[in-house]
């Protein structure tokens, strides 16, 4: 073989200055669409013309397209139409169910519990007022319309929550009272600002006490015997819920200039726990001279005990087209049921014995033995004074609060009397919408009591916070929380007592992270604002304000209203109650 010379190799090189394979002008793959693929996947088809396309212009798709991409992307290992289909693959095999599915039964027929209201006769002469407000008495003025009202065909059925929540109907609530055209909004404060307020919590001192107390029945503290549940009884006892301005004792203390601010514990506790509230409520503030009264309307929402107000999926009001069989689980019906339970539970858990009755300094100020036919309920009214003064104040700022205690109990160690506040939590159905993921009390109350109480603290944060605040304001030694459930989840007529748990108010406040200093800071801020608004007014002029919690936002609004607001409505309500009593007697 002839040797190859280097000169021949150099002569055979191309004349161009490029390096590599020869380039051609024509490209065989020009115009062929490119489909993304993974080099690790086998190709079973050349192209996919049947894939479902995403419409980028559809409303609400922006968030989806931002977080989710097509399956056919580079590196995607999920199966697609491009993948090779194995002949014996059983993943595509499915069975068609042609059986007729039966509709799920919901709750049976049931109306709300009939809660009988009662009023104090001769209340206008003695400054009294209706005892237990008749449920629905204020509906014409929006008395109980602060609950949820969600439209749509879903009724009150539950649903799963996910990324498509933007496409669901929004939950809306009605205000507790309708804002009238002649009302002037003065202030709007959100809860984030209220939560930053703080005032050193005063201890308080007793000014006077009225009423009497029966001893608490300790047998309710024991675990119930199996198949021997205690029924909740409906007892007829005279109980009163008199507002601040119509309390004859507060009127007497105001004339003696014992304080400059007056309120009741149920009204004050709502204001102090305002950042925890969800439903709408309202408080009437009356400023006369140098006196400020925190008052409430006739039939106000403050008189009702809410149920699962703070739950993530709170109970819903039924729409017009919804299933009427679930009417007993609506917020308004549950509130009426819970108010009925709390009233009767406090009466049932005491031993009504005249020998062991503990009478306070004065008799019940709202009871008239000549006109009343029902016996008095065990109740003590303690009027306590709190010092809200600051260093910048020229004169002391004192507040008198009417607090309440339900029963008394002997201390097992030293034998001293301990005053108790008795309240009840109620279970309607652990499987129904609005239950808030609560456990079944019948099977879990004594075995998993901590989990049951923790769930109630989450779902009823504002209710438990108000009760704890009322107990601390009254300087009660203990609290008794009863657990009451329906005898039948489909009926709100019968209830059973499953157990009672005792707490010290301060310990329960620590468990709930309840800061009373924040509550006193809210009260002092409202008082300072009212005084600043009326700084230039005459001392004899009466000014009235309404503080309203927004039904759908964590906001408080302060309105200036005419001095005669709500007075005509209260007179009409009083006349209706008197007429109803006369008809009942006939």
Curated annotation (Swiss-Prot):
The entry lists its GO molecular-function terms as: mRNA cap binding; translation initiation factor activity
Chain residue ranges for the region called Disordered: 102-176, 567-586
What ranges does the record give for the region RNA gate, renumbered to this chain?
301-315
Top-rank taxon = Eukaryota
- Here the segments flagged for biased composition (Basic and acidic residues) are 162-174
Q: List the disulfide bonds.
A: none
Concerning Pfam families, the annotation shows:
eIF-3_zeta (PF05091)
Instruction: Choose one Gene Ontology CC annotation of this protein and give it.
Output: cytosol
Subcellular location per UniProt equals: Cytoplasm
What GO biological process term is on the record, naming one? cap-dependent translational initiation
Please state the protein's primary subcellular location: cytoplasm
About its domains, the entry says: The RNA gate region regulates mRNA cap recognition to prevent promiscuous mRNA-binding before assembly of eif3d into the full eukaryotic translation initiation factor 3 (eIF-3) complex.
Q: Which PANTHER family match?
A: EUKARYOTIC TRANSLATION INITIATION FACTOR 3 SUBUNIT 7, EUKARYOTIC TRANSLATION INITIATION FACTOR 3 SUBUNIT D
| Description of how the protein assembles with itself and partners | Component of the eukaryotic translation initiation factor 3 (eIF-3) complex.
* Job description of the protein: mRNA cap-binding component of the eukaryotic translation initiation factor 3 (eIF-3) complex, which is involved in protein synthesis of a specialized repertoire of mRNAs and, together with other initiation factors, stimulates binding of mRNA and methionyl-tRNAi to the 40S ribosome. The eIF-3 complex specifically targets and initiates translation of a subset of mRNAs involved in cell proliferation. In the eIF-3 complex, eif3d specifically recognizes and binds the 7-methylguanosine cap of a subset of mRNAs.
This one is known as Eukaryotic translation initiation factor 3 subunit D
Per the UniProt record, the source organism is: Aspergillus niger (strain ATCC MYA-4892 / CBS 513.88 / FGSC A1513)
